[in-house]
Amino acid sequence: MSIGVVHEQTITFEAGIRLESGRILAPITLVYELYGTMNADCSNVIMVEHAWTGDAHLAGKRREDDPKPGWWDAIVGPGRLLDTDRYCVLCSNVIGSCYGSTGPASINPRTGKRYNLSFPVITVRDMVRAQELLLDHLGIRRLLCVMGGSMGGMQALEWATQYPERVASVVALATTPRPSPQAISLNAVARWAIYNDPTWKKGEYKHNPKDGLALARGIGHITFLSDESMWQKFERRFSAKDGLFDFFGQFEVERYLNYNGYNFVDRFDANCFLYLAKALDLYDVAWGYESMTDAFSRITAPIQFFAFSSDWLYPPYQTEEMVTCLQGLGKEVEYHLIQSAYGHDAFLLEHETFTPMVRSLLERVAP
């Protein structure tokens, strides 16, 4: 059952936070959405973390005639995995993004102009540090669960290691303890696409550098898919409107990348894309610790990992490295390798593959 129309909420923290870089980012505005009702002691809250270009609009619609629900609508609502008759679900837009939370596209109150490249470099840990302010504001002492895929999974790991006393359980899907050189190199090429768009102007543009950003997004889309899913979706079909020997004729897969790339330009800011890509590349769960073992020794909550067989952006072996480390520490950990043709995006597209296991975990830890 759908949860209907949901309205985003906004809170500003004037004091801000000290970032990993040592700089102070203040004030900080966070946009968030809530689904369901908190119980008396706020012990039924599940925090869902979004991925790279996601937002706080996890589920429901923004208005009655909204043609598209939130990005993980299928798992949120009465009777669904995150049952809003039982749980209160929270999703917050990360700092560095362009969907209402403070980021490069925000106005710097000291100058009255957009931050652009004067915005400080942020990390995934900084994102979570800002979210802690939100939990304090809402009166949430401890999350029943923190859950996310991809960059959302990184945030879940940060909650587990940095604030173990505030997390009762963790679900991390299609994520990594640190991006590989291959993942970093793909982001590098995406960055070059934006840097080399003459309309980018070193971040001081008036209008989004559409060609560079569309190309960058196209590169990203390739990493979200898999060889098998591309065969299933496109085969080697040629676009019907193009002649076979038209020099600019396109295969269906080319048309798909072009369409999604340029659609993305209308909804995401190029500088925010670059800053979040940097945060992804910098991510290392062992940052500030002697080792992953040292970092994971802090975890007290049961943790579930899900990897997807055709995910070549964050392949299963990267999840398995974390599982092995946690098992060696005697931590309560589950690992599920899901056979899927959908690549990295499988966690968004095949929720039924992990629903039973996550539901079981929530039943165990629920008050």
Curated annotation (Swiss-Prot):
It is found in: Cytoplasm. One of its GO terms (biological process) is methionine biosynthetic process. Keywords: Acyltransferase, Amino-acid biosynthesis, Cytoplasm, Methionine biosynthesis, Transferase. The keyword Amino-acid biosynthesis applies. It catalyses: L-homoserine + acetyl-CoA = O-acetyl-L-homoserine + CoA. Substrate binds at residues 217, 345. Residues 44-350 form the AB hydrolase-1 domain. It holds the Pfam family Abhydrolase_1. HAMAP family: MetX_acyltransf. This is Homoserine O-acetyltransferase. It comes from Trichlorobacter lovleyi (strain ATCC BAA-1151 / DSM 17278 / SZ). The lineage of its organism: Bacteria, Pseudomonadati, Thermodesulfobacteriota, Desulfuromonadia, Geobacterales. The gene is metXA.
